[in-house]
Amino acid sequence: MREAGEKQGDGLDISWSSGRAEDTGLPATSCDMVSMASAFHWPDFDASVREFARSLKPGGLFIALWNTRRYEANPLLVEIEEYLYRLVPELKRISSGRSQFCDNLTEALRGRSEFCDVLYLEGLHIELQSPERYIGLWESVNDVRVQAGEDRFARFIRHIREVTKDIQVIEAEYLTRAWIARTHKQTAFPQRE
């Protein structure tokens, strides 16, 4: 993901640094905005929130984003999802924007002393995808691959290739969900030494 971001951001005034949600390595009160997309369920929530708030300027924004495919709008995608659940009946989606983590995120952020003015937004959009792009997106979904195992995941990908072999464009509807929280205007976060 980072490599793709660096390529797309080539020529822009963007600096890249290594870090984790719980320890970004960013100086205290140095950012106007911090965001995390489709992965906020993986790190330690409390440690991440403290770190994001520490790195934000007073009044800065934290934004959590999920971009969830709404397969129900397309019969082909419904068939693909149903095949996946027949192939991996024990599958429990972890990274989906429809998870319990996301369902509780507004209240979890509102309950944090570091943030105020928590706002939730969502919107729908359509993305036209080639079959290869669609398959590539599935290949990037770690929780499905891990739970299915390599053999069943390979069968799943072969199934998608088979049912999309005569299709040029797949119409995929997405629900983008955003949680925005502002830090307080005054901050008492310690400076990183």
What are these regions (language model features)?
Residues W42-S55:
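A short, conserved alpha-helix within the catalytic core of class I
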